[in-house]
From Swiss-Prot:
Protein location: Peroxisome
Extent of the signal sequence: none
Protein name: Acyl-CoA ligase AFT1-1
Region (SBD2): 351-413
Misc remark: Gene clusters encoding host-selective toxins (HSTs) are localized on conditionally dispensable chromosomes (CDCs), also called supernumerary chromosomes, where they are present in multiple copies. The CDCs are not essential for saprophytic growth but controls host-selective pathogenicity.
Cellular component, GO annotation: peroxisome
Involved pathway(s): Mycotoxin biosynthesis
Organism: Alternaria alternata
InterPro entries named among the record's database cross-references: AMP-bd_C, AMP-bd_C_sf, AMP-dep_synth/lig_dom, ANL_N_sf
Length: 578
């Protein structure tokens, strides 16, 4: 049984461009659609320094940067081919992310987007995997970038800074090139790159790394056409709600496909003004929202929780906020209810996707909000649910692994044909299906629309005496206890070598006032009263100061499972290194 978008969703245009770069598709389209009075309206806003760029200013900055980099790196402008050029952006969020990306694209190159929280070892590994030959970074990350680049053989001359003068210098010996200086001294502007027919689908615009929550990180190749397709899918789905330009906030890492595609590029394509902000404290975030009167927030569940804790949101005028999108990890229904209690006018929407899918697969619609679901399928997306025996589901409410086909699918994994073949399956009609690894079910809402519900990661399912236990099910129950701020459930063997659900708990303020033993007893009693015996927790509840998470908010269960049994005491604490 193949599932598609609801009938009321407009169809996806059949003529998606296959010879157009991202920059040309988005900025030229926005520029052409602007009226004379809108030409001077900024579309990019730096949330920290206040700098703003119009479409024309952004494209001019990109062209001059491309010309300067071409001369500095000896990278002539030419269509992508065997001489593949890759530059890494290892930086906090900044408006120059787009100038750098599009400048490298004009040279026929690809951007490897690397998370700013990476250590030198992690950065080294990702530079090697992506074959990067240059790095764009900032003052605060320069030492890490230097260490990793020296290990992989990237010359110091190929490290570029996005910050103003006054940056870190090792003994003031090496004069690192700064983006502003390259733009200022460029003698001309390099034009847009003209791709040949079909090159949009075969040319990687970005290398984004999969989350690595259930294994080693893999470099995912996202093509120009694939990203364009996902942008069009999202905006086609949302067309009926659009009422003119919006102001959106991008605080999620641009190195992650959720922040890059769903937030930034989709907002720019809509004609929104996009405020770009590095990851910062909640107070700074809320101050920017209040100051710029941000209408749409794109968050991850952990950031939502931080905003609501301690009454922080109540100290700011947030009446400008109309809707909040969450993605990257499931939003617990109780957290959604908490938001609506404090901000009843906000529309809470979830979206679901994967880097390998080109990002978004489903989004919540204004016309059918259903708490707990991650929305309806986007136009152009086909989905099927495959059970453990290999058969497809034939009705609603049956769970299994989600397989997705979409024009936005990634090209595959870089230099890993085995992983690509395993994850991207081609059927007997020649159609490619992405095996997501997520256990899901599709249910009919009271309004008659098909909604996607995430059950859990298949690899995270716990098997107890032959029965399957979804960690998310227990986590949602445990979160209903007032003593719990956050919780993660993984598997652990008991004394009889049987798997049992193991709870890792971050206590709330109320919970911190109670003895750990009393909190543990309360949690055991709750599960025993509400769940079947095979779902009962392992006797030891592990209390931690924080849960290890990816930047998108996903709990890193693998890190929790790797904790040694010696640490599995009621009063144990997670190492600060996790």
């Amino acid at each position: 049984m193949v599932f598609t978008a609801p009938c009321w969703v407009p169809p996806l245009p059949s003529d998606l461009p296959d010879s157009t770069t991202l920059e040309e598709f988005i900025f030229c389209q926005v520029k052409d659609s602007q009226t004379r009075s809108e030409l001077d309206r900024s579309i990019l806003i730096c949330g920290t320094q206040g700098r703003e760029y119009t479409v024309q200013e952004s494209m001019e900055r990109t062209g001059r940067l491309a010309q300067g980099l071409s001369a500095w790196l000896n990278w002539p402008q030419k269509s992508p081919g065997k001489d593949w050029k890759v530059a890494a952006i290892f930086n906090v969020n900044c408006v120059d992310f787009f100038s750098i990306s599009h400048a490298i694209h004009r040279l026929g190159g690809t951007i490897s987007a690397i998370n700013a929280s990476s250590t030198a070892d992690e950065l080294e590994a990702q530079l090697r995997l992506s074959n990067a030959q240059a790095i764009f970074t900032c003052n605060t990350l320069l030492k890490i970038a230097m260490k990793a680049s020296q290990r992989v053989g990237i010359p110091l001359a190929n490290i570029f800074l996005t910050d103003a003068p006054g940056s870190y210098r090792p003994d003031d010996v090496y004069p690192f090139q700064e983006i502003d200086n390259i733009v200022r001294t460029a003698k001309s502007s390099l034009p847009l790159l003209q791709l040949g027919r079909g090159q949009g689908a075969s040319t990687p615009a970005y290398i984004c790394f999969s989350s690595g929550t259930s294994g080693a990180q893999k470099p995912v190749l996202l093509s120009h056409q694939g990203i364009i397709a996902n942008i069009v899918q999202i905006n086609t789905f949302e067309k009926f709600r659009q009422k003119g330009p919006n102001i959106s906030l991008c605080i999620l890492p641009l190195a992650h496909s959720y922040g890059l595609v769903c937030v930034a590029y989709s907002a720019l394509y809509r004609g929104d003004r996009l405020a770009v902000l590095p990851s910062s404290g909640v107070e700074d975030l809320l101050s920017i929202v209040e100051k710029l009167k941000i209408n749409t927030l794109y968050l991850v569940p952990t950031l939502v929780s931080r905003i609501l804790s301690g009454g922080k949101a109540g100290r700011h005028d947030l009446r400008c906020v109309k809707e909040v999108y969450t993605g990257g990890a499931p939003l617990h229904p109780m957290l959604g209810e908490h938001i609506l209690r404090h901000h009843p006018t906000w529309k809470i929407k979830q979206c679901y996707g994967a880097t390998e899918a080109g990002t978004a697969v489903s989004v919540t619609s204004d016309c059918d909000l259903w708490p707990g679901s991650v929305g309806c399928l986007l136009p152009g997306v086909q989905a099927k649910i495959v059970k453990s025996d290999g058969s497809e589901t034939t009705k609603h409410d049956e769970s299994g692994e989600l397989w997705v086909s979409s024009p936005s699918l990634a090209i595959g994994y870089l230099s890993n044909p085995l992983a690509t073949k395993t994850t991207f399956t081609v059927d007997n009609t020649g159609k490619t299906w992405l095996r997501t690894g997520d256990e899901v079910k599709i249910c009919l809402s009271p309004n008659g629309n098909e909604h996607l519900f995430i059950v859990d990661r298949i690899k995270d399912i716990i098997k107890v005496k032959g029965f399957q236990v979804a960690p998310v099910e227990l986590e949602q129950l445990l979160l209903s206890n007032d003593f719990v701020e956050e919780v993660a459930v993984t598997s652990r063997q008991d004394e009889g070598e049987e798997e049992r659900p193991q709870a890792f708990v971050v206590r709330s303020q109320v919970g911190l006032e109670e003895p750990q033993g009393a909190v543990a007893e309360s949690l055991h009693a709750l599960v025993k009263a509400r769940k079947a015996r095979y779902k009962w927790l392992h006797p030891h509840v592990i209390f931690v100061d924080s849960l290890p998470k990816t930047t998108s908010g996903k709990i890193m269960r693998r890190a929790l499972r790797n904790m040694s049994p010696a640490n599995s005491e009621v009063n144990s604490r997670l190492s600060s290194k996790i």
